[in-house]
């Protein structure tokens, strides 16, 4: 056997080495070849810069034909669901990113109806995945379940509005919520910290379940542990988005130009944009796992229970019909038996009358 042929196999002369230590590399290659899927929902009132932030996060334009509605249109406007999918490739790794936007949220006078549209969409994706998972061909299931929801909070209030509380409580058992303070450049650093604390206190007060970053494993390096600690401390993330390149300190940066200076989007000293993007990228797998193991399983269990109750009710109805038919048969049999008994009595009575008359004669 030639040397080239021998190199195709695990070297038998390596003591104590079987070769399954290479399995993670196989999984990695397979995952890279298949690509990744992720669905991000963005919810918040109009004018908070949601579209700009999403374009900034992924360096792409997901809304090239978006038209901003006027004030008159907003009054009559109902919430819509707009899903945009884009294929992003970076260093050979493909990501199929779907961003679900909800234009019209919070614009109507009665905002309760907008909850139903968004909740129905989340449930529909669960229902579709359950249907595909239960089918015969399960090799190419497209996962459109909502893995994460960026909920945008206005920086102009003093915390959460009643609408914010009601909506987050309505969806927190269905999707991973990441609270985001929009337009952080309208706040001073002290105002930003006060608003963050106020929002966290209100989230705890109202028992709202937001996405909690998992603790770093003990065997992780110190840099990753410190990164995890900083990300946790930054929730809710206060962000600035911009698609404009401006010159600052002799270099081109994405940011916003003001008379008093420049706010750089990707400067961690100016806002939490980089932290938000780092959180999303480094915890994308965990967000998918929580969606699968917690939110989807809860939906699936409830759905199967409802289906089970439906089947049980159908069985009960069938049993009831059988019992009614059996009762009807018994009534008919009893009626026939009574008729036969009456006929028998009549026959016996006729014979008796003949015997009596014969004695008198």
UniProtKB/Swiss-Prot annotation:
The modification Phosphotyrosine is found at residues 17, 211. GO terms for cellular component: cell division site; ciliary membrane; cleavage furrow; cytoplasm; kinetochore; microtubule cytoskeleton; midbody; motile cilium. The record marks 156 as: Important for dimerization. One of its GO terms (molecular function) is GTPase activity. GO terms for biological process: cell differentiation; cilium assembly; cytoskeleton-dependent cytokinesis; protein localization; smoothened signaling pathway; spermatogenesis. The modification N6-acetyllysine is found at residue 190. Pfam families: Septin (PF00735). The modification Phosphoserine is found at residue 218. Residues 34-306 form the Septin-type G domain. The keyword Cytoplasm applies. Residues 101-104 are annotated as: G3 motif. The keyword Transit peptide does not apply. Signal peptide: none annotated. It is found in: Cytoplasm; Cytoplasm, Cytoskeleton; Cytoplasm, Cytoskeleton, Spindle; Chromosome, Centromere, Kinetochore. It comes from the Eukaryota. InterPro entries: G_SEPTIN_dom (IPR030379), P-loop_NTPase (IPR027417), Septin (IPR016491), Septin2 (IPR008113). Residues 44-51 are annotated as: G1 motif. PROSITE patterns: G_SEPTIN (PS51719). Keywords: Acetylation, Cell cycle, Cell division, Cell membrane, Cell projection, Centromere, Chromosome, Cilium, Cytoplasm, Cytoskeleton, Differentiation, Flagellum, GTP-binding, Kinetochore, Membrane, Mitosis, Nucleotide-binding, Phosphoprotein, Spermatogenesis. Residues 182-185 are annotated as: G4 motif. Filament-forming cytoskeletal GTPase. Forms a filamentous structure with SEPTIN12, SEPTIN6, SEPTIN2 and probably SEPTIN4 at the sperm annulus which is required for the structural integrity and motility of the sperm tail during postmeiotic differentiation. Required for normal organization of the actin cytoskeleton. Plays a role in the biogenesis of polarized columnar-shaped epithelium by maintaining polyglutamylated microtubules, thus facilitating efficient vesicle transport, and by impeding MAP4 binding to tubulin. Required for the progression through mitosis. Septins polymerize into heterooligomeric protein complexes that form filaments, and associate with cellular membranes, actin filaments and microtubules. GTPase activity is required for filament formation. Filaments are assembled from asymmetrical heterotrimers, composed of SEPTIN2, SEPTIN6 and SEPTIN7 that associate head-to-head to form a hexameric unit. Interaction between SEPTIN2 and SEPTIN7 seems indirect. Interacts with SEPTIN5. Interaction with SEPTIN4 not detected. Interacts with SEPTIN9. This is Septin-2.
């Amino acid at each position: 056997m030639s040397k080239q042929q021998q190199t195709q196999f695990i070297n038998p002369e390596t003591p104590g080495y079987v070769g399954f230590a290479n399995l993670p590399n196989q999984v990695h290659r397979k995952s890279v070849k298949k690509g990744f899927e992720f669905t991000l929902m963005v919810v918040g009132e109009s004018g908070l810069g949601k579209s700009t932030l999403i374009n900034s996060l992924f360096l792409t334009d997901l809304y090239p034909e978006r038209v901003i509605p006027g004030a008159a249109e907003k009054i009559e406007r109902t919430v819509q669901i707009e899903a945009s999918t884009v294929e992003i490739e970076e260093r050979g790794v493909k990501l199929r990113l779907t961003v679900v936007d909800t234009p019209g949220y919070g614009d109507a006078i009665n905002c309760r109806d907008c909850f139903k549209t968004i909740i129905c969409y989340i449930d529909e994706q669960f229902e579709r995945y359950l249907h595909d998972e239960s089918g015969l061909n399960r090799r190419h299931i497209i996962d459109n379940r909502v893995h994460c929801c960026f909920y945008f909070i206005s920086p102009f209030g003093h915390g959460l509005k009643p609408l914010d509380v009601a909506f987050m409580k309505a969806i927190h058992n269905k999707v991973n919520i990441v609270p985001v303070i929009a337009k952080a450049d309208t706040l001073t650093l002290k105002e930003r910290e006060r608003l963050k604390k106020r929002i966290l206190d209100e989230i705890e007060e109202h028992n709202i379940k937001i996405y909690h970053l998992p603790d770093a494993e003990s065997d992780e390096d110190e840099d990753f542990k410190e990164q995890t600690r900083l990300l946790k401390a930054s929730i809710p993330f206060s962000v600035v988005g911009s698609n404009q390149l401006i010159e600052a300190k002799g270099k081109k940066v994405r940011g916003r130009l003001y008379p008093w200076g420049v706010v750089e989007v990707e400067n961690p000293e100016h806002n939490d944009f980089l932290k938000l993007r780092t959180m999303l990228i480094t915890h994308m797998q965990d967000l998918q796992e929580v969606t699968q193991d917690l939110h989807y399983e809860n939906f699936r269990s409830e759905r199967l229970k409802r289906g089970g109750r439906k089947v049980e009710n159908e069985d009960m109805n069938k049993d009831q019909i059988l019992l009614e038919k059996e009762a009807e048969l018994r009534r008919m049999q009893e009626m026939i038996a009574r008729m036969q008994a009456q006929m028998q009595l009549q026959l016996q009575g006729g014979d008796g009358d003949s015997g009596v008359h014969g004695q008198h004669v």
